[in-house]
């Protein structure tokens, strides 16, 4: 195994040697590494002076410093990203890819060698820049942040560098020109910049424990992207693909066949298209055309067949993901309940705070607007948000939001116990009436997101990244439209017509409903 990794290191050494010879790569990295830390040191000193001038606390200044460390580490990586973007497609344009691909190295050795070469230089430059920034703080007599903050920023810089470089390598393998690869780089830089903004908010509020979770989450996404590249990298594809063609017809046909289980389009759609054509050209009459009623009956029968065949088949494929997601949800509820319950000593709260907590618990279930359409739209937005986050993170961020939703249930039950309300009563009256429909819906959509991420990084012979994404997306949409949306409709009606009056009746004496 060590010898096999040594062969990959040969590619890494070759790439590093080429990079060190190219002044167009070295010059921007050297300038940014030397100038940017100095600029951030001046910015840190200016920010602290400004805060002190208006009587601000030193805590604000110290919370800004770790964010500037992230910024110092981020910008050199964005410049060095061009090396990773040209890893394969650049060699293809220069005509040097054939000798590399005809070497006796395995596909994973070629890919891993390029990945290591693309990671070492940006990470080294980032750490050098951070070191210069810390040295500048010391020269300006600015106190360093706490060690745990420094460790977190260094870890975040490392995992974000791997994330950006691994995504750039995947883009390089799928692009046909360097120009196309550079244009796609914005899909790497912009999300990471937004991620850094979110991390800066966590730093400002001093949530160190959550920052470690952010490190873990980004590391998992990085590993999944590396896995994605390794699974779908085939050297023959680099030479066989000369031009990119966006075939929307093929995309739709592939998606529709996977979604519906049939190549045929809905008969109602074909009927309306035929009517529209006949209006434009009365001569176009199809004697075999079905009437509107016949098309409706046949499509209704097809929907029943779809529910009887396709939905169970999809759920069977997702069975492992469903069980894992269910276990994660139960664990989140129990963990949150135990954690919240252990934070408060019985009898330590005064009656006024207990009454405020009781009112807050009531509003958490009763809410302000409990109309079915508002509740349905709120739940749809939540599940669409989970789906969007999951699609762009291989399911990781979607599962994180899912854990937060289920942890909220455990926290509410524990809070009910603390303020003197029976957790079982709260569960039966305030959550379960609509929860028996809403919770399975969020479990299924989260399972579909997890399944989508796993499918993308699982090798399937003869299937490209695009095909794997279309098939997985079809399964996700199938579950969402076929099961989750109907469940959310029922949940919204039950929550509005049953949960609200039941909860008001049983807890009206303890929780005034306004």
Please state what every model-predicted region is.
Residues 46-51, 144-148, 175-246:
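Terminal transmembrane helical anchor/hairpin motif
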Residues 47-64, 131-158, 206, 414-429, ...:
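Membrane-interfacial helix-loop-helix connectors in multipass membrane proteins
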Residues 44-53, 333-361, 502-509:
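Interfacial/capping segments of alpha-helical transmembrane domains
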Residues 80-101:
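Transmembrane helix boundary and interhelical loop/hinge segments in multi-pass membrane proteins
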Residues 75, 80, 105-135, 326, ...:
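Selective transmembrane-helix segments that form parts of the transport pathway or gating/packing helices
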Residues 1-32, 242-246, 250-320:
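Aromatic- and glycine-rich beta-strand/loop motifs that create alpha-glucan
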Residues 19-47, 67-80, 124, 188-199, ...:
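Hydrophobic alpha-helical transmembrane segments of multi-pass membrane transport/permease proteins
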Residues 20, 24-27, 87, 142-190, ...:
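A structural motif at transmembrane helix-loop-helix junctions in multipass membrane proteins
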